[in-house]
Amino acid sequence: MTDKTPLTESGELEYGVAFNGELHYDFEMGLSTMAQTYQALDATEAACGTTEGAKADLYYRMALMVFTLRRLGTIPPEALTPELLLDELTAEDYDRLLDATIAVKKKRQRTKNAAPDSGSPSSPSDTTA
C-alpha cells in the first residue's frame, strides 16, 4: 500500500437511509482525520451554538460521519448532511458505520512484529546432545 492509496471500509446498513424515495444501504467509510474532527466541531457549533451537551454531542457524531463517509448508496455528497443522518439513521446502522471507522483505523495501524528469532538455543542443554 502506498501513501496515495485511500484507506476505506465498505459495508451495508441493516435498515438503510431514505433519500428521494429510495433506501440506501451500501456505504464506504474513509479514515477519520483531525481535519474532519475540526470540520465536525465547526458544523456543530454553527448548528447548535455550542459543542457541549447531549444534543451537540449527537450532532457532532453525525457531522463526523458525514465528513468521513466516502459514499452512502447513490446519495449525492452535497445531500449527505448531519440533519439527514439524524432524521434517517437508526442506532443499529450508526453502530455499523462506527465499526467501519474502527476497521479503517486498524488498516492504518502499525503491525506488531513477532519477537525476533535470535538463533541461539533456548537452554544450555540444547547444545549438547
Locate predicted features.
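Short, surface-exposed, charged amphipathic helix/loop patches that serve as local interaction elements
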Residues: 2-129
